[in-house]
């Protein structure tokens, strides 16, 4: 087939594919090279060593925008997603379902009992696996009304629907629910509905609609962790100082708001999230997604000088250092103290 014929074929396919899946087919056509891994940025990757104390808040990256936070014998999950549905299945609107084998492999890194699962929005890469993870960990689900509805139709037994401004106290965790937004992909938020058009179980990627995007401010052990999955400059995070800011950086909208978001949060540590190619199995290791731009993120962070930029690799826990205020009796004049530790 000649080049013109290939273009005509692609245009024909785009015309007959429903609008939601069309976003992802465009992504397939635009992703002409695999992203690099973390080797190039090894100096930014943090993890616990055998000698490090683990009595603080431990953070484990589980891929996509999935995280586990642990403190003593308590655990909290955010957006657990391990099935990693392939891109072509999503682009062509094929039936998708949780991958039991991949979920089982990843659950080896998850605490056996989890206090709660927080979900930022209803897309499949945040919510698809949640009903199974709930059943395995006996966790309580905290999410938007739309996400709760989707999860229940997919098999979840219950859920706590929340809106911005709500506060939940679960064990040692204090969770504040914040307003958020979702990035646009090719000018539009994918699957941008607040209620599904179907009443049965979600079958296709387009059935997992966005709903009401949320962010969370988690208070634990005297430390504050902010987490979202990305978004636009409206709304920005609240003007609060946090110890760790985890912000989605998958798409241009998120990167455009980064400077303003860091200025408001003033984090000690900044962890860009949702940067990996979540259509690849976790077993293939971290690869940057085709639409990410980590060099820009790194450059913007250097210019703003708000907190230490870090990266996490899959399943390698890192303990958030305690904030150590400088001791005026010990600090020498003219010397700057380091309050962050390693």
PLM regions and their residue ranges:
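Pre-active-site segment of Zn-dependent metallo-hydrolases
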Residues: 45-50, 73-119, 123, 131-132, ...
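Beta-strand-turn-beta hairpins that frame and shape the catalytic cleft
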Residues: 52-57, 71-76, 167-176, 219-225
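Active-site neighborhood of phospho(di)ester-bond hydrolases with catalytic His/Asp-centered motifs
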Residues: 78-79, 114-122, 142-144, 226-230, ...
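Active-site HxH/HxHxD metal-binding segment of metal-dependent hydrolases
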Residues: 87, 105-168, 173-188
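Binuclear metal-ion centers of metallo-dependent hydrolases, dominated by the metallo-beta-lactamase
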Residues: 140, 152-167, 263, 268-330
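Active-site-proximal loop/helix segments of hydrolase catalytic cores
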Residues: 198-264
């Amino acid at each position: 087939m000649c080049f013109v014929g290939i273009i005509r074929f692609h245009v024909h396919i785009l015309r007959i594919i429903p609008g939601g899946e069309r976003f992802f087919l465009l992504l397939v056509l635009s992703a002409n090279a695999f992203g690099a891994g973390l080797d190039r940025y090894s100096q930014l990757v943090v993890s616990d060593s055998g000698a490090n104390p683990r009595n603080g808040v431990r953070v484990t990256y589980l891929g996509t925008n999935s995280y586990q936070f642990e403190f003593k014998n308590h655990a909290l999950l955010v957006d657990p997603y391990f099935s990693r549905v392939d891109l072509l299945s999503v682009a062509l609107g094929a039936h998708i379902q949780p991958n039991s084998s991949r979920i089982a492999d990843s659950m080896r890194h998850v605490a056996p009992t989890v206090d709660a699962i927080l979900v930022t929005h209803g897309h499949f890469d945040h919510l698809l696996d949640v009903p199974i993870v709930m059943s395995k960990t006996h966790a309580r689900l905290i999410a938007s009304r739309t996400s709760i509805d989707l999860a229940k139709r997919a098999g979840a037994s219950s859920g706590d629907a929340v809106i911005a401004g709500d506060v939940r106290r679960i064990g040692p965790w204090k969770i504040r629910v914040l307003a958020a937004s979702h990035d646009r992909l090719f000018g539009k938020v994918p699957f941008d509905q607040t209620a599904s058009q179907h009443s049965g179980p979600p079958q296709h990627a387009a059935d997992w609609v966005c709903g009401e995007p949320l962010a969370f401010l988690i208070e634990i052990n005297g430390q504050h962790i902010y987490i979202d999955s990305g978004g636009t400059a409206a709304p920005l995070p609240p003007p609060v100082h946090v110890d760790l800011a985890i912000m989605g950086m998958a798409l241009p909208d998120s990167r455009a708001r980064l400077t303003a978001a860091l200025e408001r949060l003033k984090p000690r540590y900044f962890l860009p999230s949702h940067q990996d190619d979540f259509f690849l199995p976790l077993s293939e290791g971290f690869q940057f997604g085709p639409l990410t731009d980590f060099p820009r993120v790194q450059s913007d962070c250097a210019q703003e000088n708000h907190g230490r930029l870090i990266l996490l690799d899959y399943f390698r826990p890192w303990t958030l250092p305690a904030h150590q205020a400088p001791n005026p009796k010990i600090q020498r004049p003219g010397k700057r103290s380091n309050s962050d530790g390693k």
